[in-house]
Curated annotation (Swiss-Prot):
UniProt key word Transcription: no
Designated name of the protein: Methylenetetrahydrofolate--tRNA-(uracil-5-)-methyltransferase TrmFO
Essential cofactor(s): FAD
Enzyme Commission number(s) from the entry: 2.1.1.74
Organism whose genome encodes this protein: Lacticaseibacillus paracasei (strain ATCC 334 / BCRC 17002 / CCUG 31169 / CIP 107868 / KCTC 3260 / NRRL B-441)
């Protein structure tokens, strides 16, 4: 039986390696860290979370929550590890980031079918291979991808939010509450009056950004847009985004503030909080000056400043099959953000599919296409069937899944039925895969 190569031990690569090893197939898992680090990573652990610590919604009536549940049914290492290291986050699944990546690393390195190779590759190995090197792919391998695909792909930028020392947050001003009181009161909320918001807005739009990037020429994915870029779109833009006050009444007044900045718990000890939606590329001194204008953060200590990364992705509609296999080299699979899926969970899900299909190829079976009615299948279908000319990264969402045969006006009820259909179709599909494996 051939050994499968997996390049990159991020979320997608870790998931792919796990799926392959669980089937009893040997894996060479290549990870260049710590021999060579990237600008975004801080450790040598696998599946390190370089942006937020949130894996977003957990309810199946939300598309990313459904995606997680599908992955649970398929024994995802990423979702198993996230559930095991979860921290309070209302209706979302957020993790204590270091224990999370440490758990993934421990599970993979202790698996007898996985051989870890700490080495930077500049070419594709021979044989069945999953490439999951992420948005910060090293130049040599990036060139190999360009040479294979005949096109350079696209680039965009995303950003990480600051992380704060909880002991320096003013508890006399902030209050604990989740939006609409969903789940436990997991977020700290910094309320703003109109005057406080306007003063903050003016400081934000006039603050200096770090050198090295021309914001006017950037293609920035909406889900990770720097707060200062969002603010420059209009004075009220943030009020409909991360500073939206709806459902966050101040329990001391019973009234809804003009604006609210939310802080999400970042570790199990609750000693760190991150600023929700505050990805930024401001200079570090400016971050301290501007963010201390937020009520409750007057004396806050920033333990990790917001940073910005350059990300790259391929024109998947041109170069990939919905199995995540290359159209030009069928034994070469791609997974993760480089395929145009956007988000932690989406990246891991693509690795799960690529891992299953690499396994099937190693076992002499045909790669499978997941049902489009599932969250996993709809992502694979979208990135390989949408317009290549206008291709942009995509999060999991119900809008890319086939509509129900019956029109339902109530959004929550409609989403519930879409989720029920997805899980039923996944179970049928999974049973069919298992029958093939047993023959």
């Amino acid at each position: 039986m051939p050994t499968v190569n997996v390049i990159g031990a991020g979320l997608a690569g870790s998931e792919a390696a796990w799926q392959i090893a669980q089937a009893g197939v040997d894996v060479n898992l290549y990870e260049m860290r710590p021999v060579k680090m990237t600008p975004a990573h801080h450790t040598s652990n696998f599946a390190e979370l370089v942006c937020t610590n949130s894996l977003r919604a957990n309810q199946i009536t939300n598309a990313v929550g459904l995606l997680k549940e599908e992955m649970r049914q398929l024994h995802s290492i990423i979702i198993q590890s996230a559930d095991a290291t979860a921290v309070p986050a209302g209706g979302a699944l957020a993790v204590d980031r270091e224990p999370f990546s440490e758990l993934v690393t421990q599970k993979l390195t202790s698996n007898s079918h996985i051989h870890v190779v700490n080495e930077e590759l500049s070419a594709f190995p021979d044989g069945i291979t999953v490439v999951a090197t992420g948005p910060l792919t090293a130049p040599g391998l990036a060139q190999a991808i360009v040479d294979l695909n005949g096109e350079a792909g696209l680039s965009f930028f995303d950003a990480a939010a600051p992380i704060l020392d909880a002991n320096t947050i003013n508890e006399d001003i902030v209050y604990k509450k989740s939006r609409y009181d969903r789940g436990e009161a997991a977020y700290l909320n910094c309320p703003m009056t109109k005057d406080e918001f306007l003063a903050f807005y003016q400081a934000l739009v006039s603050a200096e950004v770090a050198e090295g990037h021309d914001f006017e020429k950037m293609t920035v994915f909406e889900g990770c847009m720097p707060i200062e870029v969002m603010a420059k779109r209009g004075i009220k833009t943030m009020l409909f985004g991360p500073l939206k006050p709806v459902g966050l009444e101040d329990p001391r007044t019973g009234k809804e503030p003009y604006a609210v900045v939310q802080l999400r718990q970042d570790n199990a000890a609750a000693s760190l909080y991150n600023m929700v939606g505050f990805q930024t590329h401001l200079k570090w001194g400016e971050q301290k000056r501007v963010f201390r204008l937020i009520p409750g953060l007057e004396n806050v200590q920033i333990v990790r400043y917001g940073v910005m990364h350059r990300n790259t992705f391929m024109k998947s509609p041109v170069v990939l099959e919905p199995t995540y296999a290359s159209k030009r080299r069928p034994d070469l699979f791609f997974a993760g953000q480089m395929t145009g899926v956007e988000g932690y969970v989406e990246s891991a899900a693509s690795g799960l599919i690529a891992g299953i299909n690499a396994t099937r190829m190693a076992l002499g079976e045909t790669p499978v296409i997941f049902p489009e009615t599932t969250a996993m299948g709809s992502m694979a279908h979208y990135i390989t069937h949408t317009s290549a000319h206008h291709f942009q990264p995509m999060n999991a969402n119900f809008g890319i899944m086939p509509a129900l045969t019956v029109k339902i006006r109530n959004k929550k009820e409609r989403n519930q039925q879409l989720a029920d259909r997805a899980l039923k179709d996944l179970a049928t599909f999974q049973a069919g895969m298992n029958r093939v494996e047993q023959v």
